[in-house]
Each structure stands twice: as C-alpha cells, then as structure tokens.
C-alpha cells in the first residue's frame, strides 16, 4: 500500500469518526429534547389532577359530600383522577413526599412560614401545591409552609 493511499484511508477514518460523533451528539440532543417534551406534557397533565383536588376540597369544605347519593356522584366524578394517577405512575411520576420533613429547597418553594416552638425550624407542616418528580428529575417544585421561629 502506498503512502498516498494510506493517507486517504486515514482521512476517511477521521471523517467517519467525526460524523459518528456528530450523529451521537445529535441523538443525545434529540433524547433530551424528547424528555423535556414529555416532562412538559406531564406538567400539563398534573394541572388536571390539581383541578380535581381543588374541586374535591371545595366539595368537602361545603359539606356537599354528606349524603349517600352525593358521595356516589363524587366518587364517579373523581374516577378520572384515579385514571390520571395510574398513568402518572406508569411513567414513573410521583408526588414529592416532604410533609413533616426538613425543607429541601432543591425541590420545594417556601410560600409561607409559621412559628411553632414545639417544632424545629425548616420542618414542612403543610403542602400548598404538590411537587412531582419523574424518575430522578424534578417536574414541578412543591409549594410548602415551613416552621420558622
């Protein structure tokens, strides 16, 4: 094999390696983009669950769930919420479990503080808006109330 042919082969190998690296980078970027789109869709889906939660709270606060007929109707109306929760679980989406635990500001936003001398500072005492993760990625931060003395 002559030197010129050897050089041509080496250049071709270098070109193929460069193209391979570009394809690999493009593929990784597409995966990241798709994951972000899925996260955005899940975030919108979570808003539907929030709406059910708010409605359920209002019904209970107004005492509209006292009669047996009302309870049955409410149970039927909340069935889509259960379906939605099952779908979220299928995609490894879970509520952040932070109630009664020390605040983790990487996954929570403090929306209010309350004094309580019987508890230590930074303990989450109320969740105003549930936070969610998908796998080990944060989808939505929890909005919480914590102790501050």
Regions found by a protein language model. Name each.
Residues 119-149:
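A hydrophobic membrane-anchoring alpha-helix module
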Residues 1-13, 131, 135-138, 142:
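Short N-terminal secondary-structure initiator segments
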Residues 63-65, 117, 131:
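Disordered, low-complexity tails and leader-like regions
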Residues 2-103:
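Charge-dense, E/K-rich amphipathic alpha-helical interfaces
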Residues 98, 114, 129:
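Thr-Gly-centered strand-to-loop micro-motif
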Residues 106-115, 134:
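Sensory/regulatory domains in signal-transduction proteins
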């Amino acid at each position: 094999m002559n030197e010129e042919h050897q050089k041509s082969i080496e250049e071709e190998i270098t070109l193929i390696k460069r193209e391979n690296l570009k394809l690999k980078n493009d593929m990784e970027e597409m995966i990241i983009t798709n994951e972000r789109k899925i996260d955005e869709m899940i975030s919108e889906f979570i808003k539907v669950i929030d709406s059910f939660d708010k409605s359920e709270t209002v019904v209970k606060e107004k005492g509209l769930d006292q009669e047996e007929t009302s309870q049955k109707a409410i149970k039927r109306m909340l069935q889509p919420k259960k379906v939605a929760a099952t779908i979220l679980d299928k995609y490894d989406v879970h509520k952040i479990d932070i109630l009664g635990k020390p605040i983790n500001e990487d996954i929570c936003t403090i929306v209010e503080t309350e004094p309580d001398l019987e508890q230590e500072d930074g303990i989450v005492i109320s969740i105003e808006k549930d936070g969610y993760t998908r796998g080990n990625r944060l989808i939505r931060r929890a909005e919480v109330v914590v102790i501050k003395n």
